Amino acid sequence: MKKTYMIVHELDVNKGGMTTAMLTRSKVFLDNKIEGNLVTFDYKVNYHDILKKLIDSKKMDKRTKMFNAFSYFKESSNKKHRRNNQTITKMLSQLMKNSVEIKENDSISRFFNDKSGDYLIYRRQMNEEVIFDLFENNKRIKRLYFYYDKLHKIDIFNYKNELTAEQFYDNYGYLYIYRQINTSNGNIGNTYLINDKKHFKNNVEFCAYFLEQLIEDNNDNVMICDGPGSFPKMLETNHKKAKKFAVIHTNHYKNFDNSGAVKKKEDYILRNANKINGVIVLTEAQRKDIVKDYKMKNVYVISNFINITENYRLTNSNNIVGHVSRLVPQKGLTYLIEVAEKVVEKNKKIEFHLYGNGEERKKIENLIHEKKLNDNVKLLGYTDNVTEKIKEFGCVVSTSQVEGQGLSIIEAMLLKKPVIAFDVKYGPSDFIRDKENGYLIDNKNIEEMSKKILKVLDDKKLGNELGEKGRETIIELYNSKKLIQKWEDLFKE
């Protein structure tokens, strides 16, 4: 049985397209008797809760296993110890015993030495986690983290209040990882794995060692690196028989400015593609550009798996223009507000509902206010129920300036929503047939996009026809049987 290990820096509940793609791929793999494991490298004390939420929300299959570097070595350390190490907790208790507590509220307290008056401890509680900042000469020197009353981490600071090191503790209170932090750039430096008596010069070496311990080097094991920042860690391992692939989920070109410049992480992957078994992209157009620019042979096209939703009755009667994405520059949301302005000028009954969060939220809020669109353009934040929100829309728009595939557009088409999108690399032109199952608009043509929105919302029959054909297209293009066969063929090469 093939075992795949899909590698990414982290998992969380409110993650977007790439996480969704990995979780869906894992489920399809498992349905086809291929293990679909996930591998992460970040530190989260509450990963158990995160995985439960992902499973409860149906985003993650309950059969999917996740292996995390810290959890892996913590569990190993737990097996070596049976008695609790109370050294640090006793020290903290003694410090608090000889002090005066002044409460700011139920969650925050400060402790002062009852004789010298020195400021000793700042304590704050956040749900199940309690954090203690320890002070000497009025400067923070350590931060202790407790989760359900168990010490799990200590941060160490210098006299400038800069983080210099992190210590990680197992369930019995024993140190299992110590790592130094470069104060000038925040990079992880020397890392020490206590029970294995191992020293690593940097985080890449440490994570590569974790992969080597986790994944047996045989022909049945396959590593699939989805997170571009995690690629150097996979590349560093000494595996000879286990296969290695990298998936590029986005446009590899930089700043969508047509300069030909390539993003640093994606460029590193492509320049080192000869050292792995292959690079996978989501569209044929991207594959052709990469072959042309990098003279590569081992680049393959396999689209993301799509959850084929059940066929349901059309409800395209709403005057709601929908958009689901992160609020980041590459999504072209300033153009979307310009489109909204022109549409609302013609029909004040039309509303734009934008779901998602991100760094541009304040900028978009200000733009909405400046253009006096508060009654018609709603920023509704992150939703964990995208399907139900899309069902409310009369049509869906995309002003994105760069795409890897466009999962939210695909989901909208599956739900029979007419889609109007800027024609950008890569994605929309792979599945939108202009005037047949949606509309492809020349990039940044605000006037034309506005006209098409008004046309679709005014002519419900047209909107329903586009929606029906859109669903047919997606089901034909993204058939799971076709895609799983591509993966299986790749594993055999």
For each feature predicted by the language model, list its residue ranges:
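Carbohydrate-associated surface elements
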Residues: 250, 285, 305
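A short, active-site helix/loop in glycosyltransferases that binds the activated sugar's phosphate group
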Residues: 273-298
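A conserved mid-protein helix/loop that constitutes part of the nucleotide-sugar donor-binding site
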Residues: 319, 323-345, 352, 359-365, ...
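A short, well-ordered alpha-helix in the C-terminal region of glycosyltransferases
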Residues: 369, 389, 448, 455, ...
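Aromatic "clamp/platform" in nucleotide-sugar-dependent glycosyltransferases that forms part
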Residues: 382, 401
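A short alpha->beta transition loop at the rim of the catalytic pocket in nucleotide-sugar-dependent
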Residues: 387, 394, 416
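Short hydrophobic beta-strand element within catalytic cores of glycosyltransferases
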Residues: 418-422
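Conserved acidic donor-binding segment of nucleotide-sugar-dependent glycosyltransferases
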Residues: 433-435, 439-446, 454-461
